[in-house]
Amino acid sequence: MTITGIIAEFNPFHNGHKYLLDQAEGLKIVAMSGNFMQRGEPAIVDKWTRTQMALENGADLVVELPFLVSVQAADFFGQGAMDILDRLGIDSLVFGTEEVRDYQKIADLYTEKGAEMEKFVENLPDSLSYPQKTQAMWKEFAGLDFSGNTPNHVLALAYAKAVAGRNIKLHPIQRQGAGYHSVNKDVDFASATALRQHQKDQDFLERFMPSVALFEQASKVIWEDYFPLLRYQILSNPDLTTIYQVNQEMAVRIKEAIKTAQSVEELVELVTTKRYTKARVRRLLTYILMQARESDLPEAIHVLGFTEKGRQHLKSLKGQVSLVSRIGKEPWDAMTQKADQIYQLGKPSIAEQNFGRVPIRIETN
């Protein structure tokens, strides 16, 4: 049987995600971000709610990406997620993209010339942002030309890099309907961005979300809910360069900007430069909110939920892969668990995220 991997955030889960799961074959394993997202923001609803949505709509097994995998630039995000899915035995990866290309050929190219390609990136001027450097690399070696407004395509290239040298086939699926950043309501498939923006519009949600009741019952958060905490972390920390990935230049800019910024959005605007994209600045602010430090990734894989089919697969992995299904006295990943505790501070109504939580089971889907 085919074992298909999907790397996802489901922030929140919508019809486009359901379409992707419908297109996937065999046993479907999702490696999903926890409570903080790749572009440096809190999930609108918590990881358990999103796991339930995924299982109700076609996923067989959902595992969690650790905090230091999920809140990363595309390449590191893709690499970390692929490492986990590879260990779970996937033989193909399905993903949505704005531009369907021969990603397998791109992966083969990276297998062959990866070292040379990375050297090329290292030698590019530091005035360029990391995405600009990556795009220059793909243009040089693969003749790819694209605008930076296609985040799924950028992630797809990161996945192609991450599967290089592994026995995993890539299956791109044309992204349906609205673009990633689109807030348009008059489309066949709405984007997660639009759903977050129009979260109080009942009719809109019902049109585009398969598990709308789950979404409506859940506590919802936005970055602004954490702004007082973020301000406190910035003001009370004498040396921000002790935080993961924060350099001297960014530390100075953030300390200066917090004097006048009245919101997270304003802070991001003030700190962003040509070289430091908004997504990168948001990630740095997320690291500061967590007081994140460089740390090893957990050896074990945290299971968030499964169907009967998923449970059988987990059983077949026993002894080969270290799995955690209940977080008790032994932490799974201290950094992720700290992030979960801080996530809970966004709204008093958010349920406990770790202790006593067991994987969500769904009999059939």
From Swiss-Prot:
Catalysed reactions, semicolon-separated = cytidine(34) in elongator tRNA(Met) + acetate + ATP = N(4)-acetylcytidine(34) in elongator tRNA(Met) + AMP + diphosphate
Cite the binding residues for ATP: 7-20, 96, 152, 175
GO cellular-component term (any): cytoplasm
Q: Where in the cell is it found?
A: Cytoplasm
Per the record, a Pfam family? HIGH_NTase1
Its BP terms in the Gene Ontology are: tRNA modification
UniProt keywords (A-Z) are:
ATP-binding, Cytoplasm, Ligase, Nucleotide-binding, RNA-binding, tRNA processing, tRNA-binding
Give this protein's Gene Ontology molecular function annotations: ATP binding; ligase activity, forming carbon-nitrogen bonds; tRNA binding
> What InterPro entries does its record include?
Rossmann-like_a/b/a_fold, tRNA(Met)_cyd_acetate_ligase
The record's EC number reads: 6.3.4.-
Protein task: Catalyzes the formation of N(4)-acetylcytidine (ac(4)C) at the wobble position of elongator tRNA(Met), using acetate and ATP as substrates. First activates an acetate ion to form acetyladenylate (Ac-AMP) and then transfers the acetyl group to tRNA to form ac(4)C34.
Q: Which family, according to the similarity comment?
A: Belongs to the TmcAL family.
Question: This chain belongs to which protein, by name?
Answer: tRNA(Met) cytidine acetate ligase
Source organism phylogeny: Bacteria, Bacillati, Bacillota, Bacilli, Lactobacillales
